Amino acid sequence: MSEKSENENKEMREYWKAEEEKIIKQWADKALCYHWMHSRCREIYQKKNTWFTIPVIIISTATGTTNFAQDRFSDDMKDYVVVGIGSLSIIAGIITTISQFLQISELNEGYKTAAISWNKLHTDLKTLIARHPLDRMSPNQAIKLYKEQYEHLFEVSPPITKKVQAMFNSKFKKSANLIKPEICNKLDPTDIFEMSNLERECM
């Protein structure tokens, strides 16, 4: 058999090997972990976004209303009203600037998008590996497809906060069967495909 035919057979192979299923399981578990952590980060930043946004809304509404009604104040009070409106406007501006500097709103949306995307990847991987091997897509196609998705999500997702990492490690420290991401202070040794000398000689 020619080398070209052998390569075509490898690409057309439909059956799954145990090590390929192990790779899919690792990605599925890690995707589930990332979904959980990004969801917790979203909850934290959603609260932060609320605490930064509501005061600005209240101050802006109050200053706008007061500014509109300036003529109703006595001449003695107008100077104080102007100073008060100016001070509140400065405070609102400072709060908005701090929020923008800390990227509260952007991170809030980023964590939301990441949580949804990681959950979708986990669902796809879980569905794939739960099916009968003969009903799945080819292993080479699946690994190429989901490797690209996993790496892309890892690159574009916002960083997990230390607080959420600590929460995750505390909550799931006894989940020995769950394969966790490396960011959770867990380094796994690199696996090598095991073959006997006879199997290597027959390759």
PLM regions: where:
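Conserved non-transmembrane functional hotspots
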Residues: S2-I58, A69, V81, I95-M203
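Generic structural motif recognizing short loop/turn segments at the entrances and edges of beta-strands
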Residues: E20, G64, M77-D79
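Juxtamembrane "helix exit" motif at the C-terminal ends of alpha-helical transmembrane segments
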Residues: I59-D75
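Single-pass alpha-helical transmembrane signal-anchor segments
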Residues: S60-G64, S87-I98
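Hydrophobic alpha-helical transmembrane segments
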Residues: D75-L88
